[in-house]
Amino acid sequence: MVTLKTAVTIDTDKGDIVIDFAGSSGPSPYGINVVMNYTHAYSTFAIRSCLDPELPNNFGSLAPIIVTAPEGCIVNCKYPSPVNARHVVGMYVAMPILKALYQVMPDRVLAEGSGAVWTIQIQGRDLAGAAFTSSMFNYSGGMGARRTKDGPSATCYPTGVAAVPIEVLEAAMPILFSRKELRPGSGGAGAARGGDGQVIAWRMRTDSEWLLNAVTSRTHLAPEGLGGGEPGAPGRFLINGEPVSSARKLVMQPSDEVTLETPGGGGYGKPVAFREAAE
């Protein structure tokens, strides 16, 4: 369990916005530690996207936003802490900041989203015996709802990274997808609904064992709603229909089927608001 404790204050004398990560977890032995420039980037993005998304991204707009974190903590790690999967924690940096801003500008923030993108990497041999190693590919869950707008489905905040089309992946390696679709109802209910996650399923076209490295997110703690909105559905990582919680590299059999069900975003506002408006 990783704790991100965040305080957002405004210095009325200097006009600065100060974001402090004091109290955050210490460094992890796994590669999920985050360097300070990554933390700074996602922190300032969260502030700027609420204040004015059209602000130019330059020194003048960034200077009043001050980000601090204890040296050596998980969001300000130091060498030799491993950082290869830093997105697993780093993509959550914006969430506690948005919760703090909700107290003063509830119409500008969004509910919790699906968190970090799910990343996949595969190694093995094709039917001809030739070795292959895939590049890392990823899938997003749903974004949290805004006060007056539903959250976009299969879209990650704060990255907005796009996925490689399955046709490209099938042409590049011996993989065969059987499903790539939205996950209806996974977004949290509310006056505005959270975005839905997605379902992806595949098998490998091989007669040899193969290796799967899947880095998932939010399979236990669902994205929270805001203002009475309901949480989105947590994600599920399945092998042959059975849930898997391990993030280690897995040895897979030729006939194994992998299914990813990414989380839905949290809803915003009480769901009853829909019925009251209809009446």
Spans of features found by a protein language model:
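Glycine/proline-enriched, intrinsically flexible loops and inter-domain linkers
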Residues: M1-E279
